[in-house]
Amino acid sequence: MRKQRIQERSLIGMLITLGVVYGDIGTSPLYVMNALINDAGQLKNATPDYVIGSVSLIFWTLMLITTVKYVLIALRADNHHEGGIFALYALVRHRAKWLIFVALIGGAALLADGTLTPAVTVTSAVEGLKGLPKLGAFSQYPWLVPLTVTVILLVLFMIQGFGTAVVGRSFGPMMLLWFTVIGIFGLINISQAPVILKAFSPVYAVQVLFNPANKMGIFILGSVFLATTGAEALYSDMGHVGKANIDATWPFVYTTLILNYLGQGAWMLTHYQDAAWRNATNVNPFYAMVPAGGQIAMIILATAAAIIASQALITGSYTLVDEAVGLKFLPRMIIKHPSNVRSQIYIGAINWLLCLVTLGIVWLFQTSAHMEAAYGLAITLTMLMTTILLSQWIHMKGHRALALALLFGFGALETVFLTASLTKFIHGGYLTLGLTLVIFLIMVVWFFGNRRRLRYNQANEQISLLDYRNQLIQLSHDDHLPVFATNLVYLAKVDHQHRVKRSILYSILDKRPKRAKVYWFITINETNRPYDCSYSIDMLGTRNIVEVQLNLGFRKSQHINLYLRQIVTNLIADHSIDPQYSRYGITQPRQVGDFKFVVQNQQIMDLASNPTMGQFDRLLIGGRVLLQNITPSPAIWYGLAFSDVLEETIPLFTKPATDATLTNLTVHHARTPQRNSRQP
C-alpha cells in the first residue's frame, strides 16, 4: 500500500523521485564539460564553435535519448509497474528465443558499467578541493584525492547492510537543492555570454562534428554521451517511484541540467582566452564558474549529490541482480531486507564485490579525467539492447511502423554513440567490457546450463508423492531397517498436485533407504507482507507424511528448524501425528524427537556417463553445477547452520545411460539354485 501511494503523483512522491531516480544523470555536469575540454587538449582550444556545438550535442542527446526514448516511450513499457531491461525482457521473451541474448548482454553491461559510476562521480566531486588555495595539499599530493574517495566509498558500502531508510529521507530535499543551485549558477553565467543560447539549434551540433577545432571528430560523441548515461537507471528505477512522478519531475530536472551545461559553456566562452586559464589542461568549468566564496559549499553539495548517485547505483545493482535471480539468469543469493519496504534489499555478496571493483578502479585510474576516458562504453551496449527489446514491445502492441522507426532511428543513433565510444577501449574501457563479458558468461552458463541439464537430467522430473505413499508408509514401519531420523526433512517445492523432484524420493527410497518416523516436505513461500508467518498442512491421508506450505514475510527470519519444531508440537497436540517421546535428554518429558535436514548437491563426475551428450552441453552443465556449488548452501539460506544437516551428493542422472557397449560371452561355473534348498 505504501509503495502504491509513492507511485501515485504527489509532492512526497516527486521529492522521493528526485533522490532515487536522478542521482546518476543529475551529477553528470560534474565531469561532462571537463571531458570535452580534455578532448580539446587545453581550454584555449575550446573555441566558440567548439563550445556551442558541444553544448548543442548535449542538449539534443538529452532530448532524443533521455526525453523521447526513455521518458516518453520506455516508461510506458512497464511490467506490473516495474521497469528496466530485465522487466522489459520478461514482457517480450515469448516473441523470439534470441531475445534472451539481448537481455543478457544489456544486463551484464549495465552491471559492469555501474562499477565506474560511484568512482567517477565521487572523484569528480572531491577533485574540486584541488582548486581551493587553503587546501593546496590536494594539488601537491595527488594521492590524497583517491584516498579521500576511498574513505567516502568504503563508509558508503559499509552502511548498506544496516539499511539506508533514515539517510534516504534526506535524499530528495538534497537533490532538490542540488538541481536548484546548479540551475541558478548556470543561469548567472549564461547572462555573461548569451551567445551560448545558439546551442539550441541542431545546426551547431552537426557542424561541430566536422569543425577543425574538434580534434576528435565524431569520437567527441564518446564524451557527450556521458551526459545521458543515467537514462537507463531512470527507466530501471520506475518501480520504486512510479511513472507519474518521473513524468512530473523530469521537466524540472532537464531544465536545470541544460541551464548548467549552458552556464558552463558560457564560462568557457568568456575565459578560454584568459591568460590564467588558456594553457590549463585539467579545468573543470563546473567549479570554475562558481564564485570563490561559494566553492567550498558547492564542493560539499556536489559530494553529497555524488554519494546519493552512488547510493542509487548500489541499490539499483541489488535490484538488477534480484531480477536476474528471479529469471534464473544468476544463482540464488542471500538477500536481506533492512526495512519493511519489499523493494529495499541488501545482497552482501554483490555489495562487497561492487566495493572491491569500484575501489580498484579508483586506484587504477586515480583521476576523474582518466575515468571519464573509460566511462560509458558498456552502457551504450545496454541502451542499444533496450532499443531492440523496446521495438519488440511496441510491435507486440500492434504498432509495427512505430516499432521499425524506433529500431532503426534510435538503433542508428546509439550505434553511432557506440562507435564513438570505442576509443575508450584502450583508455580503460577494456575493463568494463571485460567485466561485461564475465557477467554475461556467468549468466549464459547458469541459464543455459540449467536448461540443458533439464533436457538430460531426469533427476528433476516431477513425480507425485501419492504414487509412493504406500512405500513411504511401509518404510517408516519396517523394523528390519534402523531409524535414520525421527523427522526426516526435505526442503522441497511441492506443487498443488503433490509433485516433487524425482531426486527427493530417489534419496529416500533408493541406495540405502532412509527410515524415519515422519517424512516432511516443506515448501517455503516468501510473501510481500514483511512479518507474515503462517503455514498450511496436508497429511496426504497418513500420519507420517506431511506436506508443509510455510509462508514467511520478506523480513521474517528463515530459521526453519524453529518453525518446524512449533509445527510438530501443534500436530502432536491435534493428534495428527504420534508423540515422539525420547528416552534420553536433559529436558524430560519431551514429545518432539530429533530432526535431520537433507540438502542435495549435484556433482559433475557423472557427466561422462551420458554418451549422447555433446561437448558443449557437457561444458554448460558442468559450469552450472560448479557455480551452484560455490554459492551459499540452502542450509545457510534457511538458518540451519547449527542443525543436523546431511549434505547429500546426488547424481545428475538417476536413469542409467543406455550405452550397450558390453556383450556377454559366457558364464562359467554357475550354480543353479535348488528348490527348498537351504545351502549357502
From Swiss-Prot:
It is a multi-pass membrane protein. Keywords: Cell membrane, Ion transport, Membrane, Potassium, Potassium transport, Symport, Transmembrane, Transmembrane helix, Transport. GO terms for molecular function: potassium ion transmembrane transporter activity; symporter activity. The keyword Cell membrane applies. It is found in: Cell membrane. The keyword Mitochondrion does not apply. Its main location: membrane. InterPro entries: K+_transporter, K_trans_C, K_trans_N, Kup. One of its GO terms (cellular component) is plasma membrane. The chain crosses the membrane at residues 12-32, 55-75, 98-118, 143-163, 170-190, 216-236, 249-269, 288-308, 345-365, 374-394, 402-422, 428-448. It holds the Pfam family K_trans_C. It catalyses: K(+)(in) + H(+)(in) = K(+)(out) + H(+)(out). PANTHER family: K+ POTASSIUM TRANSPORTER (PTHR30540:SF83), OSMOTIC STRESS POTASSIUM TRANSPORTER (PTHR30540). Transport of potassium into the cell. Likely operates as a K(+):H(+) symporter. Belongs to the HAK/KUP transporter (TC 2.A.72) family. This is Probable potassium transport system protein Kup 2.
